[in-house]
């Protein structure tokens, strides 16, 4: 189903807000798909035991509530394997969100909250 989506990422460590997408997206049950302005496809899946955030060709973030998971991020320096920890999440008809932390080895390198506002059919 074609929808309008507003996706924002909040970097809690750096107190930054980034608008990821404001425009058309697609909703298929528990899967949300959209293109960033640069043409990079993002896919978000809320599954029974895991939330997956994929920036196709760049990263796959695996999140499990109150558990450490392993994620892959491709950088100009190669592929990084990071640990992720899901703090909170919600999924309803209008808003999906996740709050998670990223660790490289045991060092905290990121704390993010990502919100996807689903505003209905276009």
Task: Tell where the protein language model's regions lie, with residue ranges.
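Terminal leader/tail segments of proteins
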Residues: 1-122
């Amino acid at each position: 189903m074609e929808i309008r989506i507003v996706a924002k990422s909040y970097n809690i460590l750096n107190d930054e807000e980034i608008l990821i997408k404001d425009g058309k997206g697609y909703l298929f049950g528990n899967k949300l798909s959209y293109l960033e302005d640069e043409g990079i496809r993002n896919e978000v899946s809320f599954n029974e035991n895991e939330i997956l955030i994929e920036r196709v060709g760049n990263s796959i973030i695996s999140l499990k509530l109150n558990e450490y998971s392993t994620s892959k991020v491709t950088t100009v320096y190669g592929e990084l394997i990071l640990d992720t920890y899901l703090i909170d999440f919600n999924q309803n008809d209008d808003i999906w969100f996740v709050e998670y932390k990223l660790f490289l080895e045991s060092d905290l390198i990121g704390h993010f909250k990502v919100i996807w506002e689903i505003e209905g059919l276009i």
